[in-house]
Amino acid sequence: MQPGIPKYTPSAIQLAPVVTGKFGERPQPKRLTREAMRNYLKERGDQTVLILHAKVAQKSYGNEKRFFCPPPCVYLMGSGWKKKKEQMERDGCSEQESQPCAFIGIGNSEQEMQQLNLEGKNYCTAKTLYISDSDKRKHFMLSVKMFYGNSDDIGVFLSKRIKVISKPSKKKQSLKNADLCIASGTKVALFNRLRSQTVSTRYLHVEGGNFHASSQQWGAFYIHLLDDEESEGEEFTVRDGYIHYGQTVKLVCSVTGMALPRLIIRKVDKQTALLDADDPVSQLHKCAFYLKDTERMYLCLSQERIIQFQATPCPKEPNKEMINDGASWTIISTDKAEYTFYEGMGPINAPVTPVPVVESLQLNGGGDVAMLELTGQNFTPNLRVWFGDVEAETMYRCAESMLCVVPDISAFREGWRWVRQPVQVPVTLVRNDGVIYSTSLTFTYTPEPGPRPHCSAAGAILRANSSLLASNEPNTNSEGSYTNISTNSANVTSSTAAVVS
C-alpha cells in the first residue's frame, strides 16, 4: 500500500471526496466548440484505459486461492495521460497529486479491492485476484476504480464478462459446450508452469521484435485455423470453425502482428504429446505445438527464451511423443475492454465514466433526410454525435442505441456540388461537458458521377475502420434502396481477411 493513499473497499469507492481547485472553485461544464473539436482532431491527445483478461476464471474451494491466470492487466495508453499530468502540475498539483491511482476487484462487496501500482509505468497486473465457491455467480466483470492522487475521480471501468468454471474439463470435449471451446480467429494466452508452481509461471509474449517467455507480461495471440495444405508464407488464408487437436494453426500477436511458423496443436497427457487426438481444444487444456514439417520439433521455453525442442518417440506407443515440461502450454481465451476519452474543454467536475462504446453503424434514408443508427454500450441522453467538427442532431433511444441526422455535405465543403473526391470524416461522441469519446468509425460522403441533382443529403458510404466484421450487403429502408437520396447504395466494408505475419 502506498503511503498517503486510503485503503478502498467496494462499499467505499463511491465516496472519494472531490477536491476543489484554487480558491475552492471548479470550472463550470462547457459545451464543446467547433474550434475545440478541430484542435482535438489535429492533436488526438486521447486517454485510453485497456483491461486485458481471460474469458474464464477457475473457482477456488474452501481456503484455497486459485489466482486468475493470466492475471488481469490494466494499461494506460495514449499521449493524453502525460498531457493531463503536465496540465495538473501547471495548475499547482504535486507530482503525487497528479499520479493516476487504481484499485481492481471482482465486483462483489465481500472481497476488498486490490491496489494497482502504476507509478513509473503505464501498466500493472493484478496477480492475487480469485473467486471463491461462496460466490454463486456464473459470470462476473472486473471493476477498476480510478482517480488521481488529489482524489479527483476518473471513474469506474468494467471488463468484459468472465465465465466461472470449476476446473478444466478432462472429458473428451464436444461442441455442445461451445462457450468452453476455442474458435478460429479469437485471441488466446499461453502460459507454462513448471512442476505446477505459481512462481514459475511464464507467458508467451512479444517484446523488442522477439517471442519470449515473460514472468511479468502476457500476450494475446490470434489463433487462426489453416488448411492442412496451406504453405508457409507471410500471407495465408484462414478457416472458420472451432480449433481441434491435430489441426494446423497460426499464432499471431494481436499487438505487433508477428507470427510463429505453422504449428500443429496437439493434446498433452502427462509428459507426452498425443498424435491421434482430434477432439475440440478447451479452456485451460494443456497442449503442445509441433512445428510443421520439422523432425519432431516443438515450441518450448528455456528460462525466458523460446526455443525448439525435439521430442522423443515412444517405442511402445507410436501415437505418442515424449516432450519436456517446457513444451507443455496451458491455453485460455482472452478478452479486452477498451475505453477512450479526452477532456475537450479542459478539466471536468464529474467522472468520465460510463464511457460509451460504438460497435456498429447502420445508415437509414427516407426523403431528404439520411439517418445514422449507432449500436453499442453505455449510451446516455447527454451525448451528441459529431461528424468531424460538425455536431449532428441526436436522439437517444436507450443505453444500446442512438439515432442522428447525417449533416449536409455543405457543412464540410463549400462548393460541394463540384466536389469529385470522397469526403471522409470521423464519427465521435461528445458529452455535454465537453468530454470527447472517439470511435474507430468514419463516415464517407461519396460524390455521384455526372451532373448533381439538387438534394439536401449527399450520397454516403459507411466505412467501419474497426476490427468489427460488418456485412457487405447494401442497406435498404422501407421505401426500397437508398437511391431516393443518391444513386449510390450504402455499403459497410471491413478490413481485408488476409493476415500478414
From Swiss-Prot:
It comes from Xenopus laevis. One of its GO terms (biological process) is positive regulation of transcription of Notch receptor target. It is found in: Nucleus; Cytoplasm. The gene is rbpj. SUPFAM superfamilies: DNA-binding protein LAG-1 (CSL), E set domains, p53-like transcription factors. GO terms for cellular component: cytoplasm; MAML1-RBP-Jkappa- ICN1 complex; nucleus. Transcriptional regulator that plays a central role in Notch signaling, a signaling pathway involved in cell-cell communication that regulates a broad spectrum of cell-fate determinations. Acts as a transcriptional repressor when it is not associated with Notch proteins. When associated with some NICD product of Notch proteins (Notch intracellular domain), it acts as a transcriptional activator that activates transcription of Notch target genes. Required for the transcriptional activation of ESR1, suggesting that it is required during primary neurogenesis in embryos. This is Suppressor of hairless protein homolog. Residues 58-68, 166-171, 193-198 are annotated as: DNA-binding. CDD domains: IPT_RBP-Jkappa (cd01176). InterPro entries: Beta-trefoil_DNA-bd_dom (IPR015350), BTD_sf (IPR036358), CLS_fam (IPR040159), Ig-like_fold (IPR013783), Ig_E-set (IPR014756), p53-like_TF_DNA-bd_sf (IPR008967), RBP-J/Cbf11/Cbf12_DNA-bd (IPR015351), RBP-J/Cbf11_DNA-bd_sf (IPR037095). GO terms for molecular function: DNA-binding transcription activator activity, RNA polymerase II-specific; DNA-binding transcription factor activity, RNA polymerase II-specific; RNA polymerase II cis-regulatory region sequence-specific DNA binding; sequence-specific DNA binding. Gene3D superfamilies: 2.80.10.50, Immunoglobulins, LAG1, DNA binding domain. Keywords: Activator, Cytoplasm, Developmental protein, DNA-binding, Notch signaling pathway, Nucleus, Repeat, Repressor, Transcription, Transcription regulation. Interacts with activated Notch proteins. Forms a ternary complex with nrarp and the intracellular domain (NICD) of notch1. Interacts with rita1, leading to nuclear export, prevent the interaction between rbpj and NICD product and subsequent down-regulation of the Notch signaling pathway. Belongs to the Su(H) family. Residues 356-446 form the IPT/TIG domain.
